[in-house]
Amino acid sequence: MKVPDARAFGSVPTGPDGRVQAFRHFWRRPRPRRPTRSTQINAGCYVFRRSVLESIPAGRVVSVERETFPRLLASGARVFGHVDYSYWLDLGTPAAFVRGSADLVTGIAPTGALPGPAGSAIILPGAHVAPDSAVIGGSTLGRDVRVAGAAVVDGSVVFDGADIGVGVRITRSAVGASARIGAGTVVCDAVIGDNADVGADNELTSGVRVWPDVHIPPGSVRFSADS
């Protein structure tokens, strides 16, 4: 796969014939402003000959990226890579999960697994959205979710039974099952755990994670100065 910045994954440059030239891993990250020469990464799909499989030691954990592939290259073995330009996303963080979900809903990432056509949102049976609220940006609402008036859910995942209050704004976030978000609260780039109770007029942004069953009193958390 090709990605904008391979430093988070390690790069795998190939020659014109597709032959792998190196496996470059960045356990110590490169200095800032020094991008890698190759933006190709190892996406973790391999085809091995039986002889290679039989050469992998048994009885311990083996990293094929750190042990097997470097050994093959050092021995002069012919290792080839296929560059795939399909949609790909590393789902290793909550933010990536939310983005991946939105990409599926909107059709950016093609799939046959959606319960309906691609569009701006998926609203599962039993969920209720007030007429003056908006669910957009590839959002998903689980079963029995309640979205009160004047609320906006944009590019987010709201799990079953959550209650979204009047005037709430949820952007690029995940809201857990049966969580409650009080009126006027802003949730952006955040994760709200199952059964969490977030009081009115809070501001939860910038990667905040609220643990399950936590109660946040009204007006307790702010990320911006009051006007």
Regions found by a protein language model. Give the residues of each.
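Catalytic-core segments of class I nucleotidyltransferases/pyrophosphorylases
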Residues: 4-6, 19-110
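Extended, small-residue-rich solenoid/repeat segments and analogous flexible loops
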Residues: 60, 73-165, 169
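Short, well-ordered turn and helix-capping elements at secondary-structure junctions
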Residues: 1, 24-27, 85, 133, ...
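Short beta-strand-to-loop element that shapes/binds the nucleotide-sugar donor at the catalytic cleft/hinge
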Residues: 1-14
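Glycine-rich hexapeptide-repeat left-handed beta-helix
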Residues: 150-157, 162-227
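Short, acidic/polar N-cap/turn motifs at the starts of alpha helices
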Residues: 9-11, 79, 205
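Conserved beta-strand and immediately adjacent loop positions that scaffold enzyme active sites
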Residues: 10-11, 44, 119
